[in-house]
Amino acid sequence: MLTIYNTLSKTKEVFKPLDGNKVRMYVCGMTVYDYCHLGHGRSMVAFDLVTRWLRKSGYELTYVRNITDIDDKIINRANENGETFDALTARMIDAMHEDERRLNILPPDQEPRATDHIAGMHAMIQTLIDKGYAYAPGNGDVYYRVGKFVGYGKLSRKKIEDLRIGARIEVDEAKQDPLDFVLWKGVKPGEPSWESPWGPGRPGWHIECSVMSTRCLGESFDIHGGGSDLEFPHHENEIAQSEAATGKQYANAWMHCGMIRINGEKMSKSLNNFFTIRDVLEKYHPEVVRYLLVASHYRSAINYSEDSLRDAKGALERFYHALRGLPRVAAKGGEAFVERFSVAMNDDFGTPEACAVLFDLVREINRLRDSDPEAAAGLAGRLRELGDVLGVLQLEADDFLRAGAEGKVDAAEVEGLIQARLQARADKNWAESDRIRDQLTAMGVVLEDSKGTTTWRLAD
């Protein structure tokens, strides 16, 4: 029985899809004006994990994650670069997909782009105007009337009165209330625009997600996800728009993943601790980065540091050492481990406990390796099966353990030296065997002898 922490109710709830076994999930995706940073990677990996477990559990999932391809940041960056906004977004979308591929993130079933849904935005905005939830002051803009929506603040638990008192908002004469937010922005010089009933312009950010989600999944759906930084105002405003327009509950459950902290501090460009996924992958194996992102519970903040990455690398090395030398066979045995893993994942996707199960499984594989290699191989298959839920442990063990050797050592030379050492050992020429080992050690190569064979990896 799967339980999910619902930000809307602030409690864990038993998950019950709206339509039998079918699950519809929408996640706020990238605003594609720059390369993906680690925070984006955290959200992508978190909901990839949710996707994998829902499907592993037998649900028929439709996963939609949008692309915001028109926005102030996009326009500003395109102008800085001297390129069109669509040239910039096309380039950044390609880069995003490459980052996802390297992190073993499954593509969503649908990936709608805001600029493909302008007509739908016009329709929803007009509905809101007709119902009195929005107004056009005549300057080309259209605003949402926050005070009219009775449920405003139900996601974030913020009260309109408190927001007004604490608001530090520039006075906008066109707004009836400082808290009102824009649905449609009138055209400005040098900006892309689309025709609309209120004059040329472009959509506000919040209306984009309301329209794309409901167009792809229907007026009500099961799960809406995103980073915790989107809870207010973005997700709060989505609820206000969508429920005012349709008269129905928008999303049944709201899931929010935690933020990335860098050495204990918030990641930001001003603190000079801002890392793109590409920056990190230049230094660390993609699977190490992914494991760092899945080993913590999705709602927790992750502290990114050299130590945390070394810990992630060490964990994966333990897993792959257990797999090394065992044939790839179908998963067999270890039902108790599967049950514990399932209990952990069904408790709001409890990956820390699930990872602990993998470590226990590794200990059992190592215990059986010599005494019952067939059973050990079956459990190794089980380790890969459970690892696949986390998006890890699908590589050949040697490939992972030797990752990074390219450009540092000549693999053919290493293999040649290993064969020469094996021959020296067969000839009982221990001095030559030790000399070759010392030579390999000086090259940064660690040898591991087992039953007449020798494998190798690079030293940390």
Swiss-Prot record:
Q: Where does Zn(2+) bind?
A: 28, 209, 234, 238
Q: What is the first-listed, main subcellular location in coarse terms?
A: cytoplasm
State the span of motif ('KMSKS' region): 266-270
| UniProt entry tagged with the keyword Metal-binding | yes
Where found in the cell? Cytoplasm
- Copy out the cofactor comment: Binds 1 zinc ion per subunit.
The short sequence motif called 'HIGH' region sits at 30-40
- Extract the SUPFAM superfamilies matched here: Anticodon-binding domain of a subclass of class I aminoacyl-tRNA synthetases (SSF47323), Nucleotidylyl transferase (SSF52374)
Keywords, A to Z, come to: Aminoacyl-tRNA synthetase, ATP-binding, Cytoplasm, Ligase, Metal-binding, Nucleotide-binding, Protein biosynthesis, Zinc
One Gene Ontology term of the molecular function aspect: ATP binding
Which HAMAP family is this protein grouped with?
Answer: Cys_tRNA_synth
| Family, similarity comment | Belongs to the class-I aminoacyl-tRNA synthetase family.
**The name this protein goes by in its record:** Cysteine--tRNA ligase
Originating organism: Pseudomonas putida (strain ATCC 700007 / DSM 6899 / JCM 31910 / BCRC 17059 / LMG 24140 / F1)
